[in-house]
Amino acid sequence: MEQGIKTCLVIMTEGVVVAPLDGLPYVKLSPNSDGTKYVDIYFAGPIRAAGASAAVLPLILGDYARKLLNLGRYTPTKEEIERYAEEVDIYQTDVVSRQIKMTLDELRIIAAGCPVCVNGIPTEDLEITAWRNLPRIPTNRVRGGMALVITEGIGLKALKVLSWAKQ
């Protein structure tokens, strides 16, 4: 699954190899609390080189593979949803400055509704303050690649991404 997602990302980005190699460190299957497995996609900062639309492609492919392999959806806990909201808000406020900033409620909707886990490796020295030491989130530091995919990929390109997913 991981190799297929990375290969498709190379094709989509027309050979910008930093995006699939460094921006998508790995994909794995992780357990939900009910025992089902879900697709867990790890992003890093270099995913930015893919562009906002292409950065979401791994989520579409991961969801497609999830369905083919009869895997479960990612079911985040309430704490994980709040962690996404806090972490991406810190990223939007303290790491990058954008004209449009997603609200905490928008971030919660995305975190709760994504069928695959948008995860990531730590890319910033900043740490989150409230929702720390969660078992399925490997770090307390801000994960820039995850935040990029949520804000610039899902948040800004949702309609375009949905049209791809339906095809």
Model-predicted segments: where are they?
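Extended, Lys/Arg-rich, non-catalytic nucleic-acid recognition/anchoring regions
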Residues: M1-Q167
